[in-house]
């Protein structure tokens, strides 16, 4: 899944390179309608049926369309947009919490039997991604600010999108990983 706006905020708070963070977020968001379904297909097509074009359309509806609508509203109705945008962080947070709660409710039985293992795996995945990215970027002679930014970008993804795609194209239990990741990436 592409990076989310949270990575831009975390980069700012960590005194990283915000311009680099925003650029990466824009690129991953624009590439996500093709890259995300391609990754789904490459990883899972032998195990389950993957409808590539359905995933493309879902990402366009959930990620790309809202971005363009937001830009359009901001351009055409700037005064109204400023009033609306004040509430968007709260609405986004409540929406993600509701999605996580629904996913957990749908998979409560399976979560109970594997929650610790799943939590450890998701934590290790996230920590390793952040640490390895930082180390490799430093070895490639990136400065500390850019290395910090890249590490944050790798460790912060649009987990809401991952949850929804898992619910629609996999199983409710698969969405649990996204729900756990949503919590872990914000710790």
Residue ranges of predicted features:
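Alpha-helical transmembrane segments of multi-pass small-molecule/ion transporters
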Residues: 1-187
């Amino acid at each position: 899944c592409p990076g989310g706006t949270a990575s831009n905020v975390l980069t700012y708070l960590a005194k990283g390179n915000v311009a680099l963070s925003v650029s990466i977020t824009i690129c991953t968001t624009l590439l996500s309608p093709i890259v995300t379904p391609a990754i789904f297909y490459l990883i899972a097509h032998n195990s389950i049926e993957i409808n590539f074009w359905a995933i493309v359309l879902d990402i366009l509806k959930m990620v790309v369309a809202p971005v363009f609508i937001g830009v359009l509203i901001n351009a055409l109705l700037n005064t109204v947009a400023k009033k609306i945008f004040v509430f968007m962080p709260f609405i986004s947070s409540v929406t993600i919490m509701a999605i996580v709660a629904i996913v957990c409710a749908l998979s409560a039985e399976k979560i109970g039997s594997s929650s610790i293992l799943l939590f450890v795996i998701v934590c290790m995945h996230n920590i390793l991604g952040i640490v390895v990215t930082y180390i490799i970027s430093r070895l490639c002679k990136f400065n500390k600010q850019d290395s910090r930014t890249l590490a944050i970008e790798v460790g912060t993804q649009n987990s809401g999108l991952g949850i929804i795609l898992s619910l629609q194209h996999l199983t409710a239990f698969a969405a649990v990983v996204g729900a756990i990741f949503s919590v872990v990436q914000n710790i």
